[in-house]
Each structure stands twice: as structure tokens, then as C-alpha cells.
């Protein structure tokens, strides 16, 4: 099996509560290599562009407002089955429905303030990685 890459965001609520280290440690303990990472403060235009697929949905404006409210940590994670395994690790979007032991069950505050984002497919991962990183910023180990 070959290595895959997935995209992760540690969202404003988790950054504000100083959970970056704890969440990154969970990624590494689960076998992910962090091959790129950086802190970003999104502009409204960047947030709207990243979440363009949700434009017109009832939650879109609140999502954009939330994502520009504080810095985020974007990262590229690598391992076999990265997309599927990362989605399992972070748990359901709604932390009330997330399984015990998942990142969202442990750290998320609510459906809106759910601490992390993860790509839902290899195609999404490629698009999301390219939105934030150039190739030279990704360093396989």
C-alpha cells in the first residue's frame, strides 16, 4: 500500500484554548507524519474561497465568521490510508455524536466549534493542500 496525504485544520476554538500540541500529539500517536504545518490567520476572502462548496447554505456565513475569528493551524499529514484513518481519528462532525477516543469527542465544544477539519476524500485533500501549501513546503521524512 502507498502513502497518502490528507489535510488538517486545527480550528480557532482549539487554537484559542491552547490545544495545538495535544491535538498534534494525537496525530503522531496515531501513526501520522506531519509533513507540513503553519499558522494562518484567514482573511474573509480566503475562508470564503476554501469553503466555496458550502456557499449558499444556511451555515456558510457563520462558518466564515468563525474561521476568521482567530488563527488556525493548517497541516499536511501522511501515512497509509491517511484520509480514512484521519476521519476516523477526528470523529463525527457533531461532537455529541462522536465516538469516545476521537479528537472531537475529547476537545470539541459544539457542532460549530468542533476543533478540527479533515479532508473527506483524496481529491479534497489534494485541493485543500494546494490551497495552503506549495510543493516546497511539504517535506516527506
Curated annotation (Swiss-Prot):
- Which InterPro entries does this one have? NDK-like_dom, NDK-like_dom_sf, Nucleoside_diP_kinase, Nucleoside_diP_kinase_AS
Question: Which PANTHER family does the UniProt record give?
Answer: NUCLEOSIDE DIPHOSPHATE KINASE, NUCLEOSIDE DIPHOSPHATE KINASE DDB_G0292928-RELATED
Organism, scientific name: Mannheimia succiniciproducens (strain KCTC 0769BP / MBEL55E)
Which cofactor is recorded for it? Mg(2+)
**Gene field:** ndk
Q: Which keywords belong to this entry?
A: ATP-binding, Cytoplasm, Kinase, Magnesium, Metal-binding, Nucleotide metabolism, Nucleotide-binding, Phosphoprotein, Transferase
This entry's Enzyme Commission designation comes to 2.7.4.6
Q: Write down any Gene Ontology CC term.
A: cytoplasm
Sites binding ATP sit at 11, 59, 87, 93, 104, 114
Q: What is this protein called?
A: Nucleoside diphosphate kinase
Q: Which GO terms describe its molecular function?
A: ATP binding; metal ion binding; nucleoside diphosphate kinase activity
Instruction: Say if the entry is tagged with keyword Cytoplasm.
Output: yes
Amino acid at each position: 500500500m502507498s502513502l497518502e496525504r490528507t489535510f488538517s485544520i486545527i480550528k480557532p476554538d482549539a487554537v484559542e484554548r491552547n490545544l495545538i500540541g495535544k491535538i498534534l500529539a494525537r496525530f503522531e500517536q496515531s501513526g501520522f507524519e506531519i509533513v507540513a504545518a503553519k499558522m494562518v490567520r484567514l482573511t474573509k476572502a480566503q475562508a470564503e474561497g476554501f469553503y466555496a462548496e458550502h456557499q449558499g447554505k444556511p451555515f456558510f456565513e457563520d462558518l466564515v465568521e468563525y474561521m476568521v475569528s482567530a488563527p488556525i493551524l493548517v497541516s499536511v499529514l501522511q501515512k497509509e490510508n491517511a484520509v480514512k484513518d484521519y476521519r476516523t481519528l477526528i470523529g463525527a462532525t457533531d461532537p455529541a455524536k462522536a465516538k469516545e477516543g476521537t479528537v472531537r469527542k475529547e476537545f470539541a465544544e459544539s457542532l460549530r466549534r468542533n476543533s478540527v477539519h479533515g479532508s473527506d476524500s483524496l481529491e479534497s485533500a489534494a485541493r485543500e493542500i494546494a490551497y495552503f501549501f506549495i510543493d516546497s513546503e511539504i517535506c516527506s521524512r
